[in-house]
């Protein structure tokens, strides 16, 4: 036991320091930056993979198991700590996981290559810890671009346009046994509950209600009975939940719903093709990464909602 402590003692200290460094950056940069910052999503994970290895000896650095396992252990413990103290929710950590684990490992391999071949003083690598605090203010000076993305989902329904139309203009309360909750619902994405409309015409206001009290305020911008309906979407700020993910995304000026539309197309076999299209806007310097997750989550949501409409219309 004493030999193990002597052999891995410094490495364990390095892991603890790495976790502490990760928590420090999370507190300094705040929740608004975690999903929208180049520094937080790409630079910090790389450094986090290096920090514990600064306390490893050359024999430990030569072990590829250590180069992979130590950064992963550091990141995993860092994530677990943030989850337990309520800094992040599971869905946030899922989104962060790819860059943190991959870049942490890459950083560790780069450190191994430099340290073993060049025998650089490990003290010099400590300056790496300052890089995020120098880059983040510079990143803030660069205006974040805003891009709009579109998601399309379709379903073929054996029902009349009238029956389908009645199930999309207004949505009666959706029972739990009607909506098949998926992975994303279980980790924090609210499921739809109902939708009401004050006037079934152009300019009418539609209210989309979700689990947990979240409400979408929707204004009808196109209305063609039994053919097409479009509406803008705004999140009611009073309905945004206090959980970390909603505050990150819906109150962070990072993700914004733009509009949605339903389009019905008659098919030659008497069935109807129903298309649900949604547009959303991302404003960050890593819109490509936000789009990756935005598309996955919205596609899952739309497909599940269309399944409810299909089932109700075919009764």
Predicted segment positions?
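Glycine-rich portal/gate segments that line the openings of hydrophobic small-molecule binding cavities
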Residues: 4-9, 22-70, 100-104, 186-259, ...
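Membrane-embedded alpha-helical segments of integral membrane proteins
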Residues: 64-115
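Hydrophobic ligand-binding cavity/cleft-lining segments
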Residues: 2-34, 38, 42-50, 73-81, ...
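A short, structured loop/turn motif at beta-sheet edges
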Residues: 157-162, 221-228, 263-274, 310-315
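Membrane-interface elements of multi-pass transporters and channels
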Residues: 27, 31, 54, 58-62, ...
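A conserved amphipathic terminal alpha-helix motif
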Residues: 97-123, 254, 260-261, 273, ...
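Conserved short-loop catalytic and cofactor-binding motifs
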Residues: 94, 152, 248, 293
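Intrinsic-disorder/low-complexity, polar/charged segments enriched in Ser/Thr/Lys/Arg/Asp/Glu/Gln
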Residues: 148-156, 205, 215, 228, ...
């Amino acid at each position: 036991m004493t030999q193990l402590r002597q052999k891995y003692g410094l490495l364990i200290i390095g892991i603890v320091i790495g976790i502490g460094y990760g928590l420090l950056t999370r507190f300094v940069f705040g929740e608004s930056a975690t999903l929208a910052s180049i520094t937080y999503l790409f630079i910090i994970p790389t450094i986090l993979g290096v920090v514990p290895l600064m306390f490893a000896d050359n024999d430990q650095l030569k072990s590829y198991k250590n180069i992979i396992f130590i950064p992963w252990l550091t990141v995993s413990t860092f994530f677990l700590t943030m989850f337990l103290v309520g800094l992040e929710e599971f869905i946030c950590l899922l989104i962060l996981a790819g860059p943190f684990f991959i870049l942490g490992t890459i950083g560790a391999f780069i450190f191994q290559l430099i340290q073993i071949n060049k025998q650089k003083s490990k003290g010099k690598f400590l300056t790496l810890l300052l890089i995020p605090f120098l880059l983040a203010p510079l990143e803030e000076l660069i205006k974040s671009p805003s891009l709009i993305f579109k998601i399309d989902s379709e379903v073929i329904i054996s029902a009349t346009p009238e029956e389908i139309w009645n199930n999309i203009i207004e949505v009666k309360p959706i029972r739990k046994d009607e909506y098949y909750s998926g992975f994303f619902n279980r980790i924090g994405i609210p499921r739809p509950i109902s939708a009401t409309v004050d006037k079934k015409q152009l300019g009418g206001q539609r209210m989309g209600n979700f689990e947990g009290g979240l409400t979408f305020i929707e204004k009808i911008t196109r209305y063609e009975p039994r053919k097409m309906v479009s509406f803008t979407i705004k999140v009611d700020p009073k309905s945004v939940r206090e959980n970390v993910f909603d505050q990150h995304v819906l109150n962070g000026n990072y993700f914004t719903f733009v509009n949605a539309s339903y389009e019905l197309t008659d098919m030659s076999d008497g069935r109807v093709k129903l298309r649900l299209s949604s547009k959303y806007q991302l404003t960050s310097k890593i819109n490509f990464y936000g789009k990756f997750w935005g598309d996955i989550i919205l596609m899952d949501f739309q497909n599940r909602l269309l399944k409810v409409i299909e089932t109700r219309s075919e009764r």
